[in-house]
Amino acid sequence: MRILLASASQRRGAILREHFPTVEQTALQGVDEAVERLPISEQVKEVASRKAAAVPIDDDHDVFVVADTLVEDPDDEQEALGKPDSKEHAVSMLLRLRGRRHRVWSATMVYALEKWQLSVENAIVEIEDFSDDVLIELIESGSWVGKAGGYDLAGMMGKYATLIEGAESTVLGFTQISMDLLADLQSLFSMSRS
């Protein structure tokens, strides 16, 4: 099964390559990710749909995948903590999340057999009330770059964050439903080619 992951995320690429042998990855250009003030579940769905609309469907791939992940502000279910654009922005986000629980939302769209399938899931993560020294270490490491909410659960923040509810894949960028669908599709494509 030949998968095209339309995402610049190294983490997403690594996750798919861990499970599927043939993954090509390309970044989408020009997708507007600014969304009006809606519940985060609707925001990730909207952005994933825009990404799906921008994917050039071709015969070189069997499956196409797009995804969007946002961290919900613990104080406002319609405010997303997206990717910080500076160290100062990352500090602000991590201070907001430190010592608290928050939701992480992912929407994943999978195109196969001539149709898109959308799934949206959330997970709850609790971040320790870590010290200012740890905050400085997290910022200086650059682990916040390109990460929703300014952290990477599978990176340095993994020492200070606990998954309370939901799937780790949801926090890292894909819904579990989509991962299960991809596994089913792989079986289907394997059978059809044998």
Enumerate the language-model features and the residues they cover.
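Cofactor-binding loop segments of dinucleotide-utilizing enzymes, especially the Rossmann-like FAD-
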Residues: 8, 28, 113
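Anionic-ligand binding patches
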Residues: 3, 37-194
